[in-house]
Design a protein with these regions (language model features):
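Short helix-coil boundary/hinge micro-motifs
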Residues: 1-144, 148-155
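Residues immediately within or flanking Cys/His clusters that coordinate Zn2+
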Residues: 142-147, 163, 168, 174
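Basic DNA-binding region of bZIP-type proteins
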Residues: 169-187
Length: 187
């Protein structure tokens, strides 16, 4: 049975990430930077984890904390720092996540565990998931949309792992149309 009970918000034609990457996918896209018009509707973006209450609901929805746990403004700020570090990894920026230390477990079931409890432990669990996904290669399929007016993080499910846009139907089409018009205009 799945531990995840939320709803994944995918772009049309977007591949579903592996289940263990879904919380990371949603964390990175909780900061929506889209600023284009699609079907007459302006995408305005926003931050869906801006308050302690929103963060508490999101973490509890992913079974990372108990629904009765206390979440503070500093927890929101720490979550934003983790999200920023993860999103910046797609632009070639390397960030050290010293704030979320992990413990290596060498036992019958080896793994990585957060060194803290509560919200910090939940964020450490997300950081550990990134480390494990890097080790198994699935993190390499997480990408940031190449469209400058989008920056949505997506899972590249293409056979050759060469996807550039979160959706070929929207962002890919817009980018290719712009390039065509630019070439036609410039001769």
């Amino acid at each position: 049975m799945s531990r995840y009970s939320g709803v994944v918000h995918l772009e049309p034609g977007e591949a579903v990430p592996p289940e263990r990457l879904i919380p990371l996918y949603e964390l990175m896209n909780s900061l929506d930077e889209r600023s284009y018009v699609r079907r007459g509707v302006r995408m305005t973006g926003g931050d869906t984890l801006a308050t302690p209450e929103e963060l508490a609901g999101w973490l509890a929805g992913h079974h990372l904390i108990r629904s009765t746990a206390t979440v503070t403004r500093e927890d929101v700020n720490a979550t934003r720092r983790l999200r920023t570090a993860l999103r910046s990894s797609f632009t070639g920026t390397t960030t050290v996540l010293d704030e979320f230390p992990l413990v290596v477990r060498l036992a019958a079931a080896p793994g990585l565990e957060p060194a803290a409890d509560g919200v910090r432990g939940a964020l450490g669990t997300l950081a550990a998931t990134v480390a494990l996904a890097q080790a198994d290669g699935s993190w390499a399929r997480m990408r940031m949309c190449a469209a400058a007016d989008c920056r949505w993080v997506f899972y590249d499910g293409s056979r050759n792992a060469g996807g550039r846009w979160c959706s070929m139907a929207s962002c890919g089409n817009r980018d290719k149309t712009r390039a065509y018009r630019r070439r036609a205009r410039d001769g």
